[in-house]
A protein has these predicted regions:
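Ankyrin repeat domain, specifically the short helix-to-loop turn at the C-terminus of the second helix
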Residues: 13-17, 44-51, 77-84, 113-117
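Conserved ankyrin/ankyrin-like repeat signature
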Residues: 42, 74-75, 107-108
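Ankyrin repeat A-helix N-terminal signature
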Residues: 33-38, 66-72, 99-105
Length: 120
């Protein structure tokens, strides 16, 4: 049985933890790919199914890093509500907050900074 529809990141059946935790050649999980596709519903479903919001790919990036770099405010908010680590550092020692500032995504920066009082 196929887990994913053709050309889609969305599962066509209930999501198992083995599917959620499966990695591609970059070490990305389904959560990383859902963020990249801006699929907030899939992000929520992965969280509900018990997906780890702090899992890192092979570059050390979490899903929150990706949301911060791309300026995906709504997804960043969902990840934060689920316990995403705002202080997670990738292999280059950059945090999601620093990524948001570097890319000019001040709404995401404000959410990270204000809600979690981390400052820079």
């Amino acid at each position: 049985q196929k887990v994913f529809g053709k050309n889609s990141v969305k599962p066509v059946c209930p999501i198992s933890l083995s599917t959620i935790n499966r990695r591609n050649i970059y070490g990305e999980t389904l959560l990383h790919r859902a963020v990249a596709h801006q699929d907030v519903d899939l992000v929520r479903n992965i969280i509900k199914a018990g997906g780890n919001v702090n899992v890192q790919d092979y570059a050390g990036w979490t899903a929150l890093h990706k949301a911060s770099v791309e300026g995906f405010y709504g997804i960043a908010n969902e990840l934060l509500k689920a316990g995403a680590d705002v202080n997670a550092r990738g292999n280059e020692q950059i945090t999601p907050l620093q990524d948001a500032v570097k890319e000019g995504h001040y709404e995401v920066y404000s959410k990270l900074n204000t809600s979690y009082s981390i400052g820079i």
